[in-house]
Curated annotation (Swiss-Prot):
InterPro entries: Beta/delta-agatoxin_fam (IPR016328). Keywords: Amidation, Disulfide bond, Ion channel impairing toxin, Knottin, Neurotoxin, Secreted, Toxin, Voltage-gated sodium channel impairing toxin. Pfam families: Toxin_7. SUPFAM superfamilies: omega toxin-like. This is Mu-agatoxin-Hc1c.
């Protein structure tokens, strides 16, 4: 279960998934990126 960290590209529907403590933000199109959820 690989995960990607802060600022890395992610796709919340099929992966790659963000590491624990991050969520996938798609506001900066065309890419989704992991942001800290704190």
């Amino acid at each position: 279960a690989d995960c990607v960290g802060d600022g890395q590209k992610c796709a919340d529907w099929f992966g790659p998934y963000c590491c624990s403590g991050y969520y996938c933000s798609c506001r900066s199109m065309p890419y989704c990126r992991c942001r800290s959820d704190s």
